[in-house]
Amino acid sequence: MDALQELLKRKWILRKEDPDLYNLVRDSVKEIRKFVQEKFGYMIIVTPYLIKLEKIPGYVEEWMGIQEFQSVQEYQMFCFVLLFLESKEREEQFVLSSLTEYIQMQFQDGVIDWTHFNTRRQLVRVLKYCLSIHIIELDDGSEEGFIKNKDTEALYENTGYSRYVIRNFAHDIMDIHSLEDIKKSEWFSMEEDRGVVRRQRVYRRFLLSPGIYRKDKNDEDFVYIRHYYRQIEKDFQSIMPCNLHLHASSGYIVLDEDCNVGTIFPSRNTISDLVLVCMQQITKKIKNRTLNVNDEEITFIEKELLLKWIRKWIKENLVFLPKKYQDMGESLVSENILATMKSYGFLDEEENRIKINPICGKIGGGFDVEVKKNVNK
């Protein structure tokens, strides 16, 4: 299912940006629509301008979200940008000041003050994200100048894609007041068929999460995985080259080396290398019982202790690192490593302690000892 792989790789496929790919996928939609609806409960949106597979997670997890955003306020600004664009026609132009005035009016009690540097920088991050997903185009000027001066102007154009950013809800969203309400509304019309709900939730979790971890011995998702292991693996292999690895308390879809669907770990960068080193060292500490695991193969550790260990592991491998990382110092690099591990869902932060998920025992690595000897010479 090459067309499905292409939809999984991207937020959407835009006809204007890649007409050949758009036509290829459009011709295959009929073939894959039934599969994604049955297995994942996903919709495929097809318009003359774009094709989008609505990828909804089985569970909302801490690391999910727009990686470019650094605050809740940026998500609020983004939603107001979408509302602003709703009133614009496709290819209609607008200036930056009209958008900033609109956003300022939407926030209550003067929360937004464009004279503040950090507030302007937040909006610039939002605008850059909007440009990256093509819901707006820059016709003249630059948003960068807005960081330095609130009176800076830029000319943008509405592409019309913004109306497809927010997913379709089956029920009135005005009745939704919490995350739990969203979860309930997702499968509201299917309550009579819990088997379908569970299957779609499991398939979504395998697709969008690094792994599925058993909550307890009666975890119904994990019971389903054990019963339908072969069918799940077969279905995912029909999408991409992979295997389902099932352990006592966790399960993973492991992609073949030549598969590049979605976000892949490890990436070819220094932080990924260091994360692998840390995961290998964590596994060693579990094996020698310095760290203990519970029945669900989860480990808890104080945050400061883990950071101390990471700094030590960085120092031991400093000779392998590019000069940029050597100059950053162990403390800053260790914080980056921790943030990266959280972003992949390898661990979660709970107040002042870290929850290390079972996947940390699944993968790991280290630098070549022989190379290190030669470097030291």
Which role does the model predict for each range below?
Residues 1-67, 145-266:
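Eukaryotic partner-binding/assembly regions in large regulatory complexes
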Residues 4-21, 90-112, 203-219, 292-325:
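Short acidic, hydrophobic short linear motifs in intrinsically disordered regions
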Residues 9-10, 72-93, 272-300:
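Positively charged, polyanion-binding regions of nucleic-acid-associated proteins
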Residues 27-35, 113-132, 326-340:
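Short amphipathic alpha-helical interaction segments
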Residues 40-42, 127-142, 237-245, 338-352:
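A short, conserved structural fragment
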Residues 83-156:
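Internal, well-ordered domain-core segments that constitute the primary functional module
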Residues 142-180, 337-377:
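C-terminal engagement modules used by replication, chromatin/transcription, nuclear envelope/ESCRT
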Residues 289-362:
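C-terminal structured domain segments
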